[in-house]
Amino acid sequence: MGKKIWLFAALWFISVGCSSEGEIYMTEVNNLWGKNDAKKIEFEIKDSQSPKNLIFVVRNNNEYPYNNLFLISTIKGEKNKVLKTDTLQYILAKPNGEWYGSGIGDVKEILVQYKNEYKFPANGKYKVELKHGMRTDQLKGIEDIGIKIENIKTTTP
C-alpha cells in the first residue's frame, strides 16, 4: 500500500511539473525562512509576445503559525534589471484554522494568483525574488515556494 502512495505522489508531481498549461519552478525553504533571505526562482521566457498568468505556489506545514502570508516579490530581467516589485498578502487558512490548498499529510500546497496576463518585455532569462514580509525574523512552516507560469490561450475569431 505504501509503495502505491509514493508512486501516486511521484506521478502527481511529474504531471504538475510538466503540465501543458504551464511550468512550475520551485525553490526550497526547508521550514525556516529568514526575513532577509531572498528566495530566487530563475526561468526562461521563450515567447514574450504571449501574455502569461503568474501564480505563486506555496507549500506549508502545520508549524506555520499564521493564517496569512505577506510576500515581497521582485521580477528581474537581464542584468538584474528590476521590472516590477510588489508587496502582497495571501490568506492560507480559513478562520477556523483549516488550511486552504491540497496535500497529503501535514504539508499543504496552495496556488495563489500573482499577475494576470503579464507580458514579459523580451525573450530571455528572468528571475523572481521572494522575501517574506511577516513580523518575525525567522518564519517557520514554509517548506517550498515557487511560481507557475501559464501561457494564456488566445482564440482567434
Where are these regions (language model features)?
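C-terminal motif of bacterial Sec signal peptides marking the signal peptidase cleavage site
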Residues: 14-17
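Bacterial signal peptide processing site
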Residues: 19-22
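Post-signal peptide N-terminal segment of mature Sec-exported envelope proteins
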Residues: 26-47
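Post-signal-peptide N-terminal segment of Sec-exported extracytoplasmic proteins
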Residues: 40-68
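Short acidic/polar inter-strand loop motif in beta-rich domains
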Residues: 61-63, 108-119, 132-140
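Short coil-to-beta strand junction motifs in C2/discoidin
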Residues: 65-71, 141-144
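An anionic, turn-rich surface loop/hairpin at beta-sheet edges
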Residues: 88-119
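Internal, hydrophobic beta-strand segments that form the core of beta-sheet-rich folds
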Residues: 121-136, 141-151
